[in-house]
From Swiss-Prot:
<keyword id="KW-0460">Magnesium</keyword>
<comment type="subunit">
    <text>Monomer.</text>
</comment>
<comment type="similarity">
    <text>Belongs to the IPP transferase family.</text>
</comment>
<comment type="function">
    <text>Catalyzes the transfer of a dimethylallyl group onto the adenine at position 37 in tRNAs that read codons beginning with uridine, leading to the formation of N6-(dimethylallyl)adenosine (i(6)A).</text>
</comment>
<dbReference type="GO" id="GO:0005524">
    <property type="term" value="F:ATP binding"/>
</dbReference>
<dbReference type="InterPro" id="IPR039657">
    <property type="entry name" value="Dimethylallyltransferase"/>
</dbReference>
<keyword id="KW-0808">Transferase</keyword>
<keyword id="KW-0067">ATP-binding</keyword>
<dbReference type="InterPro" id="IPR018022">
    <property type="entry name" value="IPT"/>
</dbReference>
<dbReference type="GO" id="GO:0006400">
    <property type="term" value="P:tRNA modification"/>
</dbReference>
<keyword id="KW-0819">tRNA processing</keyword>
<feature type="binding site">
    <location>
        <begin position="23"/>
        <end position="28"/>
    </location>
    <ligand>
        <name>substrate</name>
    </ligand>
</feature>
<feature type="site" description="Interaction with substrate tRNA">
    <location>
        <position position="113"/>
    </location>
</feature>
<dbReference type="InterPro" id="IPR027417">
    <property type="entry name" value="P-loop_NTPase"/>
</dbReference>
<dbReference type="GO" id="GO:0052381">
    <property type="term" value="F:tRNA dimethylallyltransferase activity"/>
</dbReference>
<protein>
    <recommendedName>
        <fullName>tRNA dimethylallyltransferase</fullName>
        <ecNumber>2.5.1.75</ecNumber>
    </recommendedName>
</protein>
<keyword id="KW-0547">Nucleotide-binding</keyword>
Length: 302
C-alpha cells in the first residue's frame, strides 16, 4: 500500500488511532505498520470480522500478521451468540482498562463498520434491548402493505425529524424502541454518554482510495480468497445457514451458498460477490462522508 502522505512521521505514539475506510482499502496493513513502528494493539472495528467462522471470507488478519503485533477482537464470537455495537464497546472499554493497568494502553482501532467507530468517538446511547415479541411484531408489520408508513406515523415528532425515514431498518428500529420503552429513540440518544475515546486526543484517519484502484483490488482480493479456501469456510457453515443471522451478512457468503446449493456456478457466484463488495464499499464511503468529515482523509492509489 502506497500512501500519499508520510503519515507515520506525523502520529503521536501516545495517542490512540482510529482508522476507517472502505473494504479492501488497506486499513489492516496500515494499522499493523503503525503497531510495529510505534507499538500498540490493533483492535478490530469490523462487525463481520468478529465471527469465529470467518477468517478468509472477511479478510481477517492472517495468523502471521497477528504474530507481528498484538491484535484484539478478531474472530472471538461464536456464530450462535448475539453481538452488537454495545457489546463491542464494552469489550473495547475492557481493553482500555487492561492497557491502563499494564501500561500498554495505546489502541489502534481499525475497521470498516462506521457505526462502531462513530460510537467509540461520539458515544452510544444506552437503549434497552427489544423483546423478541416486539421484534416479531415489527417484522410482521413492516412486511405488510403500508406497514412502514404506519410505523412512521406512530413515531414521535423528534424521532421523525432525527432519523432517515427512507431507511426501513432505521424506521423499524425507532418503532421498536418507542413500543418497548414508551420513549422515542431521539430522547434516548439525547442522553448519550461521553465517548470512550476523546476525538481531540486521538488520531482519526479515513483511507480514501481511488475508485478504480479499489474496484480492481476488490476483484483481485475475492479471487485470492477463493484460492485460499474461502469456499471451504462457507461449506463448513452450510448446515447452519440462516440468511437472517448476523454472521451470514459476510459479503460473498450468500453468493457462495447459492453456488454450493447448486443454483449458480462458481464464476457467477464470484461475479456477484465482487459486485456486492463494490456496493458495500460505496455505502461505507457514504457513511464516512456523512459522519466523519472532520477526520483526516488520506488518499490512496490512482
Amino acid at each position: 500500500m502506497t500512501l500519499r502522505h508520510p503519515i507515520l512521521a506525523e502520529l503521536d505514539p501516545a495517542r490512540p488511532i482510529l482508522i476507517a475506510g472502505p473494504t479492501a482499502s488497506g486499513k489492516s496493513a496500515l494499522a499493523l505498520e503503525i503497531a510495529e513502528a510505534q507499538g500498540g494493539t490493533v483492535v478490530n472495528a469490523d462487525a463481520l470480522q468478529v465471527w469465529s467462522c470467518w477468517r478468509l471470507l472477511t479478510a481477517r488478519p492472517t495468523a502471521e500478521d497477528e504474530a507481528r503485533a498484538p491484535h484484539a477482537l478478531y474472530g472471538h464470537v461464536a456464530p450462535d451468540r448475539a453481538y452488537s455495537v454495545g457489546a463491542w464497546l464494552a469489550e473495547v472499554a475492557a481493553l482500555m482498562d487492561k492497557g491502563c493497568d499494564s501500561g500498554r494502553g495505546r489502541l489502534i482501532v481499525t475497521g470498516g463498520t462506521g457505526l462502531y467507530l462513530n460510537a467509540l468517538s461520539r458515544g452510544l446511547a444506552v437503549i434497552p434491548p427489544t423483546p423478541p415479541e416486539i421484534r416479531a411484531q415489527a417484522d410482521q408489520l413492516v412486511r405488510q402493505p403500508g406497514g412502514l408508513a404506519r410505523m412512521i406515523e406512530d413515531l414521535d415528532s423528534s424521532t421523525r425529524a432525527r432519523i432517515d425515514l427512507r431507511n426501513p431498518a432505521r424506521v423499524q428500529r425507532a418503532w421498536e424502541v418507542l413500543t418497548t420503552t414508551g420513549r422515542g429513540i431521539a430522547a434516548w440518544q439525547a442522553e448519550t454518554p461521553p465517548p470512550l475515546i476523546d476525538p481531540a486526543a486521538a488520531h482519526l484517519l479515513v483511507l480514501n482510495p481511488d475508485r478504480d484502484w479499489l474496484a480492481e483490488r476488490i476483484a483481485r482480493r475475492f479471487h485470492l480468497m477463493l484460492e485460499q479456501g474461502a469456499l471451504d469456510e462457507v461449506r463448513a457453515m452450510l448446515p447452519h445457514w440462516n440468511p437472517d443471522a448476523l454472521w451470514a451478512k459476510a459479503i460473498g457468503a450468500p453468493e457462495l451458498v447459492a453456488h454450493l446449493q447448486g443454483r449458480i456456478d462458481l464464476d457467477e457466484a464470484a461475479r456477484r460477490a465482487v459486485i456486492a463488495t463494490r456496493q458495500y464499499a460505496k455505502a461505507q464511503r457514504s457513511f464516512f462522508r456523512g459522519r466523519m468529515r472532520d477526520w483526516r482523509w488520506i488518499g490512496i492509489g490512482g
